[in-house]
């Protein structure tokens, strides 16, 4: 595990998906609640971003907000695009949802130190060890949104 980029043991997590309207804002909300429930909010900064700019300024997809709300999550992050100039240096971990996200973010890294911050969400799966990614539910149905949340949790 990388050490925090500062001396206060404060970890900065950045979740990445394609458009920042489904998976990464859901991960942001899930991890926020987990950290709060463990009374560790003072040790984490959590954010999310998208690779593309299509949805910048938008709320998360309505379906993800609805499915998240059924589980008690407030998925309300305003979409933004990943910024290689600031986000690599501002983050201790950049957690991507799938292999395409991983490749795209790693290509933007200017050195090995930045690349070492990029990890896959699947590396944290405890109940779904056979899964290789968090599939994008955007073109799917209700079960796809539920499955994405299952994996993220």
Role assignments for model-derived ranges:
Residues 2-91:
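Conserved active-site segments centered on acidic
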Residues 30, 35, 56, 85, ...:
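Extended aliphatic helical segments
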Residues 2, 93, 99-153:
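Phosphate-binding/catalytic loops
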Residues 23, 96-97:
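Small/polar loops that bind or transfer phosphate-bearing groups
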């Amino acid at each position: 595990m990388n050490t925090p980029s500062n001396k206060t043991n404060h970890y900065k997590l950045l979740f990445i998906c394609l458009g920042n309207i489904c998976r990464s804002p859901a991960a942001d909300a899930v991890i926020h609640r987990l950290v709060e429930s463990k009374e560790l909010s003072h040790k984490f900064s959590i954010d999310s971003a998208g690779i593309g700019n299509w949805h910048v300024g938008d709320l998360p997809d309505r379906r993800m907000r609805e499915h998240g709300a059924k589980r008690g999550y407030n998925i309300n992050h305003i979409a933004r695009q990943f910024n290689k100039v600031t986000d690599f240096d501002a983050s201790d971990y950049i957690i991507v949802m799938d292999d395409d996200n991983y490749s795209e973010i790693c290509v933007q890294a200017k050195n090995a130190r930045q690349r070492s911050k990029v990890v896959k969400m699947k590396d944290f799966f405890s109940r779904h060890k056979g899964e290789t990614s968090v599939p994008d539910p955007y073109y799917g149905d209700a079960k796809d949104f539920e499955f994405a949340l299952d994996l993220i949790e």
